[in-house]
């Protein structure tokens, strides 16, 4: 709510219909008729008032009625009112940042009287970073006696101007540089350190270098003055991790500033919050390389930054696909896709950086606990890594010694990660690299891949309860069922975590968190997500009376595992698929493909130990079982497969409802096993002989090959030759 007249924009000419509806809505708020007020506000919103008009209406409204509504109105009325007020706030922000208004204020600042000057300083502060381009231009064009006024204005604005001012230090004018360095030294914000260090160590006038050093010391105190590339790298890492020192204020726009060397002016690029911190990290890495193109220490962070950007974009696009981000406009979605294309194109060439930097990036991701980035690094190393990277065991069997260090040590360490996806992808990468030599971690690779093949779903659950013991208990019990658990210990955290990406598959909530429960049951993002309420003897009756038929189940505290299991069954009874299942299938596929690609003749890995796990995965969708059957073909060529495995393959081949690709893959695997075993079982022969009459020519051909490899009798082949006319239309007797 605007209270200071000096901050009020000029009033926008109003649309009579919108004005009438808005005034009626506010009157209804004042009368506490909240449902009727909500309907009126919805009509106002349906007429698409622009931001400036909404701002004028807001400023003319009865403020107390709006305040009371936020305290007393039902959630649906509050939500509708918030939508209107967010449009009005956009109008206020647009007005504060209007360049024509800023130009008038800068003029008042530089040539106005004392009162106008201080009024301009105050109002320019509300414009924040948006005022910097004009203030810098004015510094370039005016005489030194006005510079102090501009510097005073910038210092009063403070932290919001640090990023554009740091970029503006690239200006050629040394007088302007002096002023900007002085301002940054007075503000004392660590985000300016890299740019100041670049001046101090760069090819600048001695007076500029001296001013830069003085500003640096004001910021760091007695700390060590570091080189510019190191400063840029440290700042990039701070943005990558979203450390407190680099967080934007809630009211600030997310802008990436650049200096145009040709025009000697600032340029800006507005970005969404999800992109800002990672793109800033990327920019700062390149700033370091601009100063020293041999400074390869930035490469691991740059790799992590790109992988994290792609992961973040994919999460948002996934939510768009599920219809869970209604607040995104078509332009927002187009921006997401454009960013994905850009990052994908860049990542297609990052392999040129060399595998040593991907190992370092993996180390960085593991240290940060960033599973998504670690998995991406492991996937890249699956293509780049080689046997020479492994920590090979040397010496004879009695006195074996391990190489002190090896490039692939981060992958070996990842086999012990608490995160399944990190373990599974590390095993896949090591399987691709393994040769005949034993190496540290070898004994974990195949068992880990077998675990990955056994994944059948990794749903995401929210556990929200004020009792930490309940949270810890459910974390363990749900984790054993392959749930990914996000926890919240109070109602506010429950709401924040409940709507954080990725969206949850089930919400397990303390019955006392009524506000959160009601929100989960009504919000479009969560109303289709099953809710399980944790009740006590004291509130069970009231809770069931209120929420019976609205939630999936009630579970009494203290929670018994059997009760929770029954509740989960009830919660998911009508849900056919989840994003968690997709994650599990990805794990299955990665493991099967890794086993399919192992050179069985040149590996120390006990690949035969994976045969049973591969056989069990034949019930999975084609994307997985095709790779599993390739793996069985690969392994079966060199190791005998059990009868049960062959029976499983026969079931796939003999079922005409399966895809042709799956049936062919199973026959190929059976053929490889038959060649290895110098024959096959009667059950396999029986299936193969039946398939000689299959309607698919490719299936008939593969079945014939299996029979030939089985050293079978010539009977089936003669039958095949005797039915030479079964391809195409039946031949009619007497036909020409």
Regions found by a protein language model. Name each.
Residues 4-20, 89-100, 105-108, 220-231, ...:
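TPR-adjacent "capping" and linker segments in tetratricopeptide-repeat scaffold/adaptor proteins
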Residues 23-30, 40-43, 56-60, 85-96, ...:
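Structural detector for internal amphipathic alpha-helices that build alpha-solenoid repeat scaffolds
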Residues 55, 60, 65-70, 227-229, ...:
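Short coil/linker segments at helix-helix boundaries
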Residues 104-112, 134-142, 153, 164-172, ...:
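Alpha-solenoid HEAT/Armadillo-like helical repeat scaffolds in large eukaryotic proteins
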Residues 482-490:
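Short hydrophobic/Thr-rich beta-strand motif most characteristic of the beta2 strand and flanking loop
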Residues 501-510:
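Active-site beta3 strand of CheY-like receiver
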Residues 515, 537-554:
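Alpha4 helix (beta4-alpha4-beta5 surface) of REC/receiver domains from two-component response regulators
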Residues 528-538:
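A short, hydrophobic beta-strand element within the central beta-sheet of small alpha/beta folds
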């Amino acid at each position: 709510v605007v209270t200071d007249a000096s901050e009020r924009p000029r009033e926008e000419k109003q649309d009579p219909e919108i004005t009438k509806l808005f005034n009626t809505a506010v009157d209804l708020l004042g009368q506490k008729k909240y449902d009727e007020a909500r309907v009126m506000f919805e009509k106002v919103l349906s007429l698409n008032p622009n931001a400036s008009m909404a701002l004028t209406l807001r400023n003319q409204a009865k403020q107390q009625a709006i305040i009371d509504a936020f305290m007393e109105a039902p959630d649906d009325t509050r939500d509708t009112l918030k939508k209107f007020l967010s449009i009005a706030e956009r109008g206020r922000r647009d007005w504060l940042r209007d360049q024509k208004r800023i130009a008038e204020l800068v003029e008042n600042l530089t040539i106005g009287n004392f009162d106008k000057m201080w009024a301009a300083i105050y109002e320019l502060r509300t414009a924040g970073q948006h005022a910097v381009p004009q203030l810098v231009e004015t510094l370039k064009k005016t005489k030194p006696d006005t510079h102090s006024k501009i510097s005073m204005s910038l210092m009063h604005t403070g932290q919001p101007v640090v990023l554009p001012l740091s970029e503006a230090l690239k200006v050629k004018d040394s007088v302007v540089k002096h002023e900007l360095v002085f301002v940054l030294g007075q503000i004392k914000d660590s985000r300016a350190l890299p740019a100041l260090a670049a001046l101090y160590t760069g090819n600048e006038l001695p007076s500029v270098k001296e001013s830069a050093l003085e500003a640096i010391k004001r910021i760091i105190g007695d700390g060590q003055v570091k080189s510019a590339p190191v400063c840029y790298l440290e700042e990039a890492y701070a943005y990558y991790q979203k450390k407190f020192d680099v967080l934007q204020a809630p009211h600030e726009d997310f802008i990436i500033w650049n200096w145009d060397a040709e025009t000697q002016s600032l340029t800006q690029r507005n970005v969404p919050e999800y992109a800002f911190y990672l793109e800033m990290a990327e920019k700062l890495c390149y700033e370091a390389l601009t100063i020293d193109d041999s400074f390869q220490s930035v490469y691991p962070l740059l790799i992590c930054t790109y992988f994290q950007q792609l992961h973040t974009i994919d999460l948002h696009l996934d939510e768009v696909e599920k219809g869970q981000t209604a607040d995104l406009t078509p332009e927002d979605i187009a921006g997401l896709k454009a960013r994905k294309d850009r990052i994908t194109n860049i990542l297609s060439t990052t392999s040129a950086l060399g595998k040593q930097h991907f190992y370092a990036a993996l180390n960085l991701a593991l240290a940060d606990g960033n599973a998504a980035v670690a998995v991406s690094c492991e996937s890249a190393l699956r293509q780049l890594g080689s046997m020479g990277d492994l920590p090979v065991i040397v010496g004879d069997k009695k006195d074996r010694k391990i190489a002190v260090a090896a490039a692939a040590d981060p992958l070996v360490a990842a086999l012990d990660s608490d995160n399944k996806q990190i373990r599974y992808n590390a095993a896949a990468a090591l399987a691709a690299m393994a040769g005949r030599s034993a190496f540290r971690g070898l004994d974990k690779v195949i068992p880990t891949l077998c675990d990955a093949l056994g994944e059948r779903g990794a749903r995401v659950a929210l556990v929200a309860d004020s009792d930490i013991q309940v949270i810890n208990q459910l974390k363990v019990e749900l984790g054993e069922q392959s749930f990914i658990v996000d926890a919240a210990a109070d109602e506010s955290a429950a709401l924040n975590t409940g709507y954080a990406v990725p969206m949850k598959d089930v919400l397990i909530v303390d019955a006392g968190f009524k506000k959160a429960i009601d929100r989960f049951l009504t919000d479009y993002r969560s109303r289709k997500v099953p809710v399980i309420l944790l009740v006590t003897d004291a509130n069970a009756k009231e809770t069931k009376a209120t929420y019976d038929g609205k939630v999936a189940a009630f579970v009494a505290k203290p929670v018994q595992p059997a009760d929770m299991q029954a509740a989960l069954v009830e919660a998911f009874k009508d849900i056919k698929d989840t994003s968690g299942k997709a994650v599990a299938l990805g794990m299955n596929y990665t493991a099967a493909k890794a086993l399919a690609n192992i050179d069985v003749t040149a590996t120390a890995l006990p690949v035969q130990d994976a045969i049973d796990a591969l056989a069990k995965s034949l019930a999975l969708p084609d994307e997985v079982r095709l790779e599993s059957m390739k793996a069985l073909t690969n392994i079966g060529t060199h190791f005998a497969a059990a009868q049960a495995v062959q029976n499983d393959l026969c079931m796939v081949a003999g079922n005409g409802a399966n895809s042709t690709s799956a049936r062919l893959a199973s026959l190929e695997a059976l053929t490889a096993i038959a060649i290895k075993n110098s024959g096959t079982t009667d059950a396999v022969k029986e299936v193969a002989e039946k398939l000689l009459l299959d309607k698919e020519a490719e299936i008939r051909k593969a079945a014939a090959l299996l029979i030939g490899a089985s050293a079978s009798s010539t009977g089936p082949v003669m039958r095949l030759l005797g039915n030479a006319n079964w391809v195409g239309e039946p031949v009619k007797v007497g036909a020409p």
